[in-house]
Amino acid sequence: NYYSRGVSPFIKNMFDSNEINGEAWSRYAAGYMWGITGIIYNPDAVSKEEASTWTIINNSRFKRQITIKDNVRDSMFAAIGAIKSDKLTSKSFLASKDYKEKLAQEMNDTSDDTIKEVQEYLQEVKDNAYSFETDSAKADMITGKVVAGYQWSGDAVYTMDQADKDDFTLNFAVPKESTNIYFDGWVMLKSGIGGNDEKKQAAQSFINFLSKPEN
């Protein structure tokens, strides 16, 4: 099929090597796309330096002019990056021999103290942000309602391309503290397929259609 013949080596490796409950992702999911998170911004209003840190989400200079993602994983990730910014960007931390492992521990810290600190920080962010959103920030950036937004890289590219058509420049910055890699994938739900061969074939055909290079 198109997916097995055309899946990128990078996605195949990631889906083969990562597991949930002892099963590789590739056992039940077909990779669709991947990317990172960062800050899309208007360079006429926001400097690259200001956009290159998670602390921008609570920067009062952009009060009611920045959007944040409306989901737990992304908002908590950004908040942890902002709260721990000084530590994560310190020379001693960056020079650690086990830097990747330490960074993963810090960014995935779910201790009671950190959760409480994140909750309090996001309450402040709520007062500073234009909105917590999932999809509306693309239009808000293009129309100039906001000057910056927490964005997935795929949506950021789309937004920048649309802005270019209007001779309007937008840029994308990766926060210096850390970013995260996301993977989107397709799965067939057992409750939806339920041993129905026609539904299974239809689902597989849909995934194959999306996996065609021209699509």
Pin down the residues of each PLM region.
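Extracytoplasmic ligand-binding site segments that recognize negatively charged/polar headgroups
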Residues: 1-128, 133-136, 140
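A residue-level structural signature of the nucleotidyltransferase/glycosyltransferase Rossmann-like core
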Residues: 31, 38, 147-148, 180, ...
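Residue-level detector of short, conserved catalytic/binding motifs and their immediate flanks
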Residues: 37, 64, 147, 184-186, ...
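Local beta-strand N-terminus motif with an aromatic residue
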Residues: 62, 146, 166-170
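Paired acidic/hydrophobic, glycine-rich loop segments that form the ligand-binding mouth/hinge
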Residues: 130-131, 147-152
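Alpha-helix capping/helix-boundary segments
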Residues: 137, 155-156
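Extracytoplasmic/periplasmic substrate-recognition and gating elements
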Residues: 151, 155, 162-215
